[in-house]
């Protein structure tokens, strides 16, 4: 058969293309094998084959998922580190093999950006030690420790740390975002109680960041975003004892009560005494209120609530309890509505495993040294995974949301179906604590309240999923121009309509860029909304 000149050219092009694709596939395969070989040598603490997961493993799907069920991010390899030195070696492996390294402490990233496509995920969940000092004023704590396990470990020394409520959130992500809690109006954010941190840099070196060493890095890693400047492997935390508290939980089951309760909450809660921090949880047809009076008595709290005006709305169910120790305070409104003696407290929900999440579908679960912090009490039930869709907004002190706009938003929530499990978790801020340190979190002084919205997306019904996504797009379009640009970096949103760097980092952006340039000039540690070593588009420095 004779080929025309054109046919010959096309045949040659196809042959070249096939050859190029074959070479590219071979190169990728060789790179992956090079990475795996290096990682095998880096995991010096043993159990190498168990601590490396790639797409050939039947536990890969479980291992790549954190809390969010998603089918967008497929890392090349997941390595479960046990010591800081392993993390340093793993970073060097990624560099040599041509891969990015992505740290994962708790797996709660709202967009699943702690397991990015084609990367080496360095999982820190087994760097979860808690070493309390002899005088119990400080502790060295692994960045992968989950909050529930941390609190149980500190209970043994009759001390604690002002972190959040969710027991499966890890310390690394909490501090990197700022870290708010039901004690924050009196005590400030979790990041303020970090005395130092050890950080693996992009070149694989391990440095200590504190107020006297690598001060710029120390500033950035507290509230300047996670997985950006280096990989934090552990923290030195300042510990404390909480005074006994009084707790309140109030619920309303009439849909018509949602707006008046929420409006009263925003008018009243953020301007109460700093010892009182509270939130409302707004649903499709109900609303509830939760508050902690740190150091207050039951009578003091009853007086506060009686004067709030909340009890004049609808027919509320009210629970108020006093003399609540630290664990009772954290459990109140979630697993109990009564503060009981310490030896009667059911702390099961806090006794989370290093791998705490529920099984997804019939995919086998990854298990490695999955032991609870306290083997003497029942293990926490697996934390449910779901397809989260969410948004975050800060209400600023100089831009309080008008009542009519709040009502519109609540009416929008009522339009979603029951399957969405729509939830607005709205916290009173207006932090007046004098403990503020110099750190990167940008909204501490101006935040009046924080509003998070979330639904359970549908994995099986594309029409329903599209409806939910449009609802969030409509919420962004309606609410963002009215409430402002500020959002919480711990609740990132790929579909935010504003410049994400301005929204998450505010006036800290330019200083954070300088830190990034100093410690990671080649942008080795990155995710779609991470600070870059050059000034981001739309930002003026």
From Swiss-Prot:
Q: Which residues are glycosylated?
A: 30, 57, 117, 131, 158, 253, 306, 343, 430, 461
Q: Which GO terms describe its molecular function?
A: FAD binding; oxidoreductase activity
Q: Which cofactor does it need?
A: FAD
Going by the record, the broad EC class of this enzyme is: oxidoreductase
Instruction: Summarize what gene deletion causes.
Output: Leads to the accumulation of pyranonigrin G.
Which pathway does UniProt place it in? Secondary metabolite biosynthesis
Q: Any idea which UniProt keywords this protein has?
A: FAD, Flavoprotein, Glycoprotein, Oxidoreductase, Signal
Q: What is this protein called?
A: FAD-linked oxidoreductase pynB
> Organism source for this protein?
Aspergillus niger (strain ATCC MYA-4892 / CBS 513.88 / FGSC A1513)
Organism classification: Eukaryota, Fungi, Dikarya, Ascomycota, Pezizomycotina
Q: Which gene encodes it?
A: pynB
């Amino acid at each position: 058969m004779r080929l025309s000149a054109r046919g010959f050219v096309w045949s040659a092009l196809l042959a070249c293309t096939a050859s190029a694709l074959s070479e590219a596939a071979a190169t990728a395969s060789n790179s992956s094998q090079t990475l795996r070989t290096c990682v095998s040598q880096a995991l010096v603490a043993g159990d190498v084959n168990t601590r490396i997961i790639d797409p050939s493993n039947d536990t890969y799907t479980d291992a790549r998922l954190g809390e969010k069920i998603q089918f967008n991010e497929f890392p090349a390899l997941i390595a479960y580190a046990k010591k800081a030195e392993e993390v340093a070696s793993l970073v060097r492996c990624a560099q040599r093999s041509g891969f990015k390294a992505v740290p994962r402490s708790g797996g709660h990233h709202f967009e699943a950006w702690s397991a990015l496509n084609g990367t080496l995920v360095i999982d820190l969940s087994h760097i979860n030690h808690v070493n309390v000092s002899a005088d119990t004023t400080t502790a060295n704590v692994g960045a992968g420790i989950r909050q529930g396990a941390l609190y149980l470990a500190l209970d043994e020394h009759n001390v604690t740390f002002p972190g959040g409520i969710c027991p499966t959130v890890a310390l690394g992500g909490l501090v990197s975002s700022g870290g708010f809690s039901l004690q924050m109006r009196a005590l400030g954010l979790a990041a303020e109680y970090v005395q130092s941190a050890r950080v693996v840099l992009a070149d694989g070196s391990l440095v200590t960041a504190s107020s006297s060493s690598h001060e710029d890095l120390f500033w950035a890693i507290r509230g300047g975003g996670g997985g950006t400047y280096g990989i934090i492997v552990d923290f030195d935390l300042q510990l404390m004892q909480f005074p006994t508290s009084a707790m309140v939980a109030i619920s309303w089951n009439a849909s018509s009560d949602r707006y008046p309760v929420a409006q009263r909450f925003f008018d009243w809660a953020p301007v109460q005494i700093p010892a009182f921090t509270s939130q409302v949880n707004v649903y499709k047809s109900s609303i509830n209120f939760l508050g902690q009076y740190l150091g207050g008595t039951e009578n003091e709290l009853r007086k506060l609530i009686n004067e709030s005006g909340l009890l004049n709305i609808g027919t509320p169910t009210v629970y108020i309890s006093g003399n609540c120790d630290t664990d009772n305070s954290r459990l109140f409104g979630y697993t109990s509505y009564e503060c009981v003696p310490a030896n009667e407290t059911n702390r099961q929900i806090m006794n989370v495993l290093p791998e705490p999440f529920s099984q997804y579908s019939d995919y086998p679960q990854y298990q490695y040294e999955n032991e609870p912090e306290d083997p003497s009490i029942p293990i926490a039930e697996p934390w449910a995974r779901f397809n989260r869709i969410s948004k975050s907004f800060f209400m600023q002190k100089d831009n309080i949301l008008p009542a009519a706009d709040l009502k519109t938003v609540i009416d929008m929530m009522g339009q979603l179906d029951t399957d969405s499990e729509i939830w607005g978790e709205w916290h009173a801020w207006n932090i007046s604590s004098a403990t503020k340190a110099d750190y990167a979190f940008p909204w501490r002084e101006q935040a009046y309240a924080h509003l998070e919205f979330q639904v359970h997306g549908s994995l099986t019904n594309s029409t329903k999923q599209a409806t939910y996504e449009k609802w969030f797009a409509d919420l962004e379009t309606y609410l963002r121009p009215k409430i402002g640009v500020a959002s919480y970096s711990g609740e990132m949103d790929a579909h935010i309509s504003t410049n994400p760097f301005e929204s998450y980092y505010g006036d800290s952006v330019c200083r954070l860029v300088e830190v990034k340039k100093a410690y990671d000039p080649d942008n080795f540690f990155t995710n779609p909304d991470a600070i870059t070593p050059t000034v981001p588009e739309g930002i003026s420095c």
